A protein has these predicted regions:
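C-terminal motif of bacterial Sec signal peptides marking the signal peptidase cleavage site
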Residues: 27-31
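Bacterial N-terminal signal peptides that target proteins for export
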Residues: 3-19
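Core segments of small alpha/beta cavity-forming domains
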Residues: 36-113
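Short beta-strand edge/turn micro-motifs at domain boundaries
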Residues: 147-154, 166-205
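C-terminal or late-domain output modules
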Residues: 32, 40, 70, 197-205
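Surface-exposed, charged secondary-structure patches
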Residues: 87-163, 201-203
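Short glycine-rich, low-complexity/disordered patches
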Residues: 68-72, 158, 171-176
Length: 205
């Protein structure tokens, strides 16, 4: 099964299960939540991004669901459904743990700057990020997975988990702009799968 996460980890972590993409957004939304709810706290776009990273680091996925999809089993399931990725529900816990490990090892942010215009109901946060370098990751793991673990999903995931943490798979710093909409008197992300795709290096162009 090939975890299809990053429309490119789609090859390796969900590749490994089709990994989430090989391991684990894309629609405009008015609420960034697994339950369709929005945060009751009125944060600016920059404060929202900082809050998301704080909650992700402490693994408070229930609170994080008020802002965007995270690394919970429910988020993984919704992400796979959104992206048309085949997955086996019994492996959701493992997908979640692997993606959380990728976040812990590779994702950083710095130099956040904000633009917010309530009149046009648009906002953005631009920053410097690092994430998983999916191209390098796939180059390193594809051959071994296909030759040695092709029909053994457990072995694929064990191998993937064993190489997460290698510094060579951390991307160089890249700039990215996170888009927001002002809806119902609060700022919400336009991309509900932002955190998952950032983690998988999808925005590192």
């Amino acid at each position: 099964m090939k975890l299809k996460f990053s429309y490119r980890l789609k090859k390796t972590l969900l590749r490994a299960a089709t990994l989430f993409c090989a391991v684990s957004t894309a629609v405009a939304m008015t609420a960034c939540s697994d339950k369709g709810e929005t945060s009751t706290v009125q944060l600016s776009p920059k404060e929202t991004v900082e809050k998301i990273f704080t909650l992700a680091k402490i693994k408070d996925y229930d609170s994080l669901a008020e802002y965007c999809r995270s690394f919970s089993k429910m988020s993984m399931e919704l992400y796979f459904t959104d992206t048309g990725t085949d997955y086996d529900a019994k492996w959701l816990s493992r997908y979640s743990a692997t993606l959380a490990s990728i976040f812990d090892n590779y994702v950083t942010y710095d130099n956040l700057t904000e633009k917010a215009d309530k009149e046009t109901r648009t906002g953005s946060v631009t920053g410097t990020f690092t994430a998983l370098d999916m191209e390098k990751f796939n180059e390193k793991t594809d051959s071994k997975i296909n030759s040695e673990f092709k029909n053994d999903y457990n072995a694929q995931m064990d191998y993937i988990d064993s190489v997460i943490g290698d510094k060579e798979f951390k991307s160089k710093e890249f700039e990215y702009t996170i888009e927001f909409k002002y809806v119902n008197e609060q700022w919400t992300l336009t991309d509900k799968n932002f955190l998952i795709l950032l983690t998988l290096g999808y925005y590192n162009k």
